[in-house]
Amino acid sequence: MSPRIQQLAAVLLAAVVVVAAARDEPAAAKNYQTQWDTVMSILNCKSDSLIPSYICSVISKSRWGWASDDPNDDEYTPPDHPLPAPAAGRRRWPVMTSLNLTKYVDSLPRIAKIRGYGIRHGRPVPIKLTIGMYSKTWQFHRDMPPTPVFVYGQSLQTATFPGPTIVARQGVPLAVEWQNHLPDAHILPWDPKVPTAIPKKGGVPTVVHLHGGAHPPEFDGHAFAWFTRDFAENGSTWTRKTYTYPNVQAPGNLWYHDHALGLTRVSLLAGLLAAYVIEKPELEDPMNLPCGDHDLHLVIADREFYTNGSISIDREWKPEYFGLVITVNGKAWPYLSVQRRRYRLRILNASNARYFNVTLSNGALPFTVIGSDSSYLSRPVTVSNLVLSPAEIFDVIVDFSRLPAAMTEIEMLNTAPYPFPNGPNVTDPNLDGKVMLFKVAGKGKVDDMPDKSKVPEHGVPYASVAALPPPTTTRYIVLYENQTAPGNLYINGLRLEDPVTETPKSGTTELWQVINLTGDNHPLHLHIATFQAIKMTKIEGFQVFKDCMIKNNNTATCNLDQHAVGPVVPVPEEEKTWKNAVKIPPEFMTSVVVAFRLVEANQPYPFDATTEPGFVYHCHILDHEDNAMIRPLKLLP
């Protein structure tokens, strides 16, 4: 018997022993985790593994799961209804990580685009699209089984993870009928203790929110405007099958995703997310930016997978979801072959809770930032790294022609701790900081076409903070955690269901002083409005102020003016524009100017933004949003 066969036999025997022991003693399964991890590390399911991939697949399906009471239950099946957390001593099945998936074996998918307008007599005209939500499987990695997902598409066959990018034209309305074709039960478990849309007749509630969109409230995707398959059942604020997006705002990058009450974190985790772009050729064409095949979306999202391919999430609500696999455009650690030329990369962090601090091979190439969220910058800004919160978008140019001739590979790396910013700065062996790889053509390779693009000298001159009408109101927005019931994360000590307290007048500007009493950085997102941070002030005597606020929930009583006197931290240059998500650091008061009007034209909305059901604002860490860092926002005439 050859040494390789002997080694293989020993590994297989070890796997059988560990699995059998764990199944015989579920309560003591944790004692076998180290042995199992060792076995799986050797098997590895990699192309260079000791054993062929098909044998590895068989072994990987033999691991213990939630220690099922059913001895015949050998496969994990996503629950058809919410289930309690596993009892003490029960184990999850081993998951896919950077240790058992080979990186850079799948090419980066090019996301399909849907044109959101028609052409008649050479001019763009409004059209109607029908886009559905479908249940299917998706291959996240060459060596993984297919994964059950929920995805957007114009048909089941064309639906993808992420969904198709809708390309709209500024000033041309787009009607979309959103259709729910999802099954009777969610593919992921959800926690019934969190306020959740629960239909009486079964089905998966969904509603689509255009993140960054300026539109009437009835088209906003309100959390209570959910509906189930074939519109069989709907929430209290549902009114229509078709949403109309006026696309009157400035050109830029948006995205659309599910927003049903209490299910946002699991439905986006399942795949209900996609990009949306508003174009304005007369403004953008003269900028001569990289276009066509050299203009790409990079939709980054972390996930955790069981080794049978299904997505893993705890059955009970947890403060943050962090996956051990980094996906870009629906592939785990993909690669992209590029020419030595400029590329435009529209980078969206679509993760539930993970922040990214990305570099290109630790600064080998810079990012030239031309836009953030749905707005261009007033001028390009060159940086060595980008910090992206969940839901944040950076529009950048990367010039691969600047690489040394001998350098033909460059990695996108992430160094952000998790939770951000105070998570441990210890390297997790299951997550090594890699995001994706760019394979750069050799110096002598002939480009497919000459690079005539450029980095523009100037961006877009939106109305500045000073040019807008002066703020009519100053509001104090306080972010709490565990103020009442354990686990709740509230804004101003209130829930979504509590009476509205933020009632700005449509067309006005306000100053929001956002105070973060938690240990996390929170990406603040306001529906309808665009906004920008102007400064961040350290809160001195933080614990004294926090204790007072938890007791009194009143900034005047707690002498905010005596505490918000610490060092002032400037806003990064690449974030100085009108945004849809602003980072709120812990122990700071962040001053945010909020424009309830169109900032490109510096005009009021050309539609009625005061109708029902109103809007919301919330933290865009999805686990926080669901429980319950979200509040109503009602514009007044």
From Swiss-Prot:
GO terms for biological process, alphabetical: cellular response to phosphate starvation
Record's GO cellular component terms: endoplasmic reticulum membrane
Segments forming domain Plastocyanin-like: 334-406
Cofactor: binding details: Binds 4 Cu cations per monomer. The Cu cations are bound as 3 distinct Cu centers known as type 1 or blue, type 2 or normal, and type 3 or coupled binuclear.
Residue positions binding Cu cation 4: 522, 619, 624, 629
UniProt keyword Acetylation present: no
Function summary: Multicopper oxidase that may play a role in the maintenance of inorganic phosphate homeostasis.
Name of the molecule in the record: Multicopper oxidase LPR1 homolog 5
Source organism per UniProt: Oryza sativa subsp. japonica
Upper lineage: Eukaryota, Viridiplantae, Streptophyta, Embryophyta, Tracheophyta
